[in-house]
Amino acid sequence: VLAGYSVTVTAGGSVCWQTGWIESDASSVVYGGRELPVGVPVEVMVSVRNRAGEESGEAWASFVVGLLPKGAHAEWITDGTYTGDDTAALYFRREFTVRRELTTATLYCAGIGYQSVTINGTALSDAHLDPAHTDYTRLISYTVDVLTSMELSPGTNAVGIAVGLGWRGGKLPNGMVPSFFGRPMLWALLVLRYADGTVETVATDDRWQVSRGAITSATIYD
């Protein structure tokens, strides 16, 4: 039976909250530390002990705090020539420069219908149905990827994002045309945090390239 716990929360190498041992049988605990940074991996370590004083090993979990509205400065972009009869995927690309030593680099991405993200030609994930489907007129999900030094290098780098229609368009078996149908669109924000404390962002805007590619049809049924 649970009799006590210890929780330590760290972010960017510094401790944000440390409870020490608390005598309690509570299975949920409200965070009581300092404000967690956005876009930086947060690690949580938990240990528990029973009434006999026997302690468990340390259990770890990690997460990234989501974007706040004040930090979400990027534009929705698409291909203006895309028509209602088109079903091809759109390919978006942007080069950027890593100028000095990074501490973290975080990519927030919402490609509707579905996206495939590469950094310097290497896929970030094997997921094929990101972001989660929603009614795009009301709510849009986004993904978060914390990039490593193996994925980014000093100098010129490139982010490429292919966006297929998915649930964004195409022909449904019943002939319906939902209100959330439309062109494939992309919203993305890459936040580069340097060791000297400076921050740079690479956001979707009119400087991104967009083109068609090898995928000529990418609806949910085709």
Summary of predicted features, one role per range:
Residues 40-45, 50-52, 64-69, 82, ...:
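Accessory beta-strand-rich segments of carbohydrate-active enzymes
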Residues 76-83:
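Short, solvent-exposed loop/edge segments of extracellular or virion-exposed proteins
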Residues 59-62:
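Terminal edge beta-strands and adjacent linker/stalk segments
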Residues 69-76:
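Acidic, His- and aromatic-enriched active-site or binding-groove loops in soluble protein domains
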Residues 2-41, 51-55, 76:
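Recognizes extended acidic, P/S/T-rich segments that occur
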